Swiss-Prot record:
Residues with attached carbohydrate: N56, N122
Protein source organism: Arabidopsis thaliana (Mouse-ear cress)
Name of the protein: ABC transporter G family member 25
Activity regulation info: ADP and vanadate (ABC transporters inhibitor) inhibit the ATP-dependent abscisic acid (ABA) uptake.
InterPro entries per record: AAA+_ATPase, ABC2_TM, ABC_transporter-like_ATP-bd, ABCG_dom, ABCG_transporters, P-loop_NTPase
SUPFAM superfamilies listed in its UniProt record: P-loop containing nucleoside triphosphate hydrolases
Chain intervals for the UniProt region annotation (Disordered): 1-30
Entry's localization field: Cell membrane
Xref: PROSITE patterns: ABC_TRANSPORTER_2 (PS50893)
């Protein structure tokens, strides 16, 4: 029995020849067939990872108790774990392959390997596309759908796919053609009824799980991939939704000549019948690869058959788990079943599979077509220009973030704070220096903590989507980052400007349009600097919980050294106030209200040297105002430092994002 019955006929048959469209710029011709056929081969694929651990389990307990450790306690043992071991298979254009196996069998690792997403010395073996190595050009024709649906929840289905089309389709296509391509994919995958519904997620009500999975597939179909790899696309779907989704995938393979590979955990019998080729994994080793219709006959030939009629997929998964019910009651234990099947595969099936792969060759005519189509004529595969990427990403960001930036609770938070400040300091007297200094410092605290804390979640929350889109080459890092910078300028400044507008005139701070505009400018610059701190910490740590803790401690240090709470900062901590955004904002707000300092000293009854004969306490207060409130940092120096922080923190955030591998 041949593992790949009829492979040679399919490779040389009429279905494998490329189908050229009359006008490659039309969306229907762009999506109706593969630009070139892809034959995927993988031979003896192995993947190993090294696990580092302590040789003595008591080492961690000793560290917690503060006990001394022996040199032997610090010796680390390195264990190498094999995820994949000698996996071999092949799939031709127009075929639908399913990778079966229990959890932890290596299905996702194999799919990442064949999709070109695993690199390094840990991966060995051959992975060939059209008898050649994986290249950047072939990766551009490979679509990868992850198990999790990584989509923006506030965008509608249409908006999601339109933005993808504008970013991923070649720049040679006009905008109208790209929009029609998005509409074509929406219609093809049956998303028309929900195209104007938000995608949603666990917390936001939106489309169903099956529809969300089809949106993820449409995300990749827009580039018209010749090879489509899907990691457990039916996970979380009911039987009917899973069947409809698999029917769609089978239609892409059989009707459009695409090469489709998917992993699936536990398919129904109806779903199993749609697979052309099945590959069964168990603990990283292959137990079967071949036509799905031949699987039961093969296992019967090696001594394993079900005692009663059952779903073939369930029987295969039982075998992969090392369990076989021979009479409906007893079970053979796992080691015997698994080892027997591995030995049978290595002896009977593996040689036939490798021979079939060796004798099948990709037609030279098709190879020349691929080279011409990708490198020469036809539609160029260049992505959008940098400026176009910036505009599209900025538009998408504004649509997605408007719900977060102008959330009702967030607006209530700012309005409530503004009203409380206005009532607490209602028409305060210009000579009530201590009261007004308290208000100015409260403003510095509130608009330092709030923007930094909100910004710290930006990049950690988008990490998964950002990594996937960068891996698919949708845009450059610089355009993505610049879109976030510009988006924050337009959205994050509305609330602080509204807060100050109400509070300033309710409190009746220094009258005049010029002092108000100066105060507003300082506050907005301070908000952007504080936001930059949050972006930098979030990008550097990339863990929302840890980053929020770090930014809270950092802002606490900035507040304590801001020049209001402590009369005399310890000499060892003086440096902290000079890196504090709160320190410079507070200095500027005081300077705008009371000038260079002579006026505020005069109001307190201090002479030019900061002395007063009334009492020692009052004299100490004068010295505090003179040394800490007025200080030795000028207005222009403070403005310059805030601008430096505004740019510096964002540069650090950009450099931190460059570390992320995709």
């Amino acid at each position: 029995m041949s593992a790949f019955d009829g492979v040679e006929n399919q490779m040389n048959g009429p279905d494998s020849s490329p189908r050229l469209s009359q006008d490659p710029r039309e969306p229907r011709s762009l999506l109706s067939s593969s630009c070139f056929p892809i034959t995927l081969k993988f031979v003896d694929v192995c993947y190993r990872v090294k696990i580092h651990g302590m040789s003595n389990d008591s080492c961690n307990i000793k560290k917690l108790l503060g006990l001394k450790q022996k040199p032997s306690d610090e010796t680390r043992s390195t264990e190498e774990r094999t995820i994949l071991s000698g996996v071999t298979g092949m799939i031709s254009p127009g075929e639908f392959m399913a990778v079966l196996g229990p959890s932890g069998s290596g299905k996702s690792t194999l799919l990442n390997a064949v999709a070109g997403r695993l690199h390094g010395s840990n991966l060995t073996g051959k992975i060939l596309i059209n008898d050649g190595k994986i290249t950047k050009q072939t990766l551009k024709r490979t679509g990868f759908v992850a198990q999790d649906d990584l989509l923006y929840p506030h965008l509608t289905v249409r908006e999601t796919l339109v933005f993808v089309a504008l970013l991923r389709l070649p720049r040679s296509l006009t905008r109208d053609v790209k929009l029609r391509a998005a509409e074509s994919v929406i219609s093809e995958l049956g998303l028309t009824k929900c195209e104007n519904t938000v995608v949603g997620n666990t917390f936001i009500r939106g489309i169903s799980g099956g529809e969300r999975k089809r949106v993820s597939i449409a995300h990749e179909l827009l580039i018209n991939p010749s090879l489509l790899v899907l990691d457990e696309p039916t996970s979380g779907l009911d039987a009917t939704a899973a069947l409809r989704l698999v029917q769609t995938l089978a239609g892409l393979a059989h009707g459009k000549g695409k090469t489709v590979v998917t992993s699936i955990h536990q398919p129904s019998s109806r779903v199993f019948q749609m697979f052309d080729t099945v590959l069964l994994l168990s603990e990283g080793k292959c137990l079967f690869v071949g036509k799905g219709r031949d699987a039961m006959a093969y296992f019967e030939s090696v001594g394993f058959s079900p005692a009663f009629p059952m779903n073939p997929a369930d029987f295969l998964l039982d075998l992969a788990n090392g369990v076989c019910q021979t009479d409906g009651v007893t079970e053979r234990e796992k080691p015997n079943v698994r080892q027997t099947l591995v030995t049978a595969y290595d002896t009977l099936l593996a040689p036939q599979v490798k021979t079939c792969i060796e004798v099948s060759h990709f037609p030279q005519d098709n190879a020349r077509f691929v080279k011409t189509r990708v490198n020469g004529g036809g539609i160029t595969t260049c992505i959008a220009t940098w400026f176009s990427q910036l505009c599209i990403l900025l538009h998408r960001l504004l649509k997605e973030r408007r719900h977060e930036s102008f959330d009702l609770l967030r607006i209530f938070q700012v309005v409530a704070a503004s009203i409380l400040c206005g009532l607490m300091w209602w028409h305060s007297d210009y000579r009530d220096v201590h009261d007004r200094l308290g208000l100015l410092f409260f403003i510095s605290i509130f608009w330092g903590v709030l923007p930094s804390f909100n910004a710290v979640f930006t990049f950690p929350q988008e990490r998964a989507i950002f990594t996937r889109e960068r891996a698919s080459g949708m845009y450059t890092l610089s355009s993505y980052f610049m879109a976030h910078v510009l988006g924050s300028l337009s959205m994050e400044l509305v609330l602080p400007a509204s807060f100050l507008t109400f509070t300033y005139w309710m409190v009746y701070l220094r009258p005049g349009i010029v002092p108000f505009l100066l105060t507003l400018s300082v506050l907005l610059l301070y908000v952007l600097a504080s936001q930059g701190l949050g972006l930098a910490l979030g990008a550097a740590i990339m863990d929302a919980k840890k980053a929020s803790t770090i930014v809270t401690v950092t802002m606490l240090a900035f507040v304590l050294t801001g020049g209001y709470y402590v009369n005399k900062v310890p000499s060892g901590m003086v440096w902290m106030k000079y890196v504090s955004t709160t320190f410079y904002c507070y200095r500027l707000l005081v300077a705008i209200q009371y000038g260079s300092g002579e006026e505020i000293l005069r109001m307190l009854g201090c002479d030019s040297k900061g002395k007063q004969g009334a009492s020692a306490a009052t004299s100490a207060g004068c010295r505090f105002v003179e040394e800490e409130v007025i200080g030795d940092v000028g207005m222009w120096t403070s403005v310059g430092v805030l601008f430096l922080m505004f740019f510096g923190y964002r540069v650090l955030a950009y450099l931190a994002l460059r570390r992320i591998k995709h």
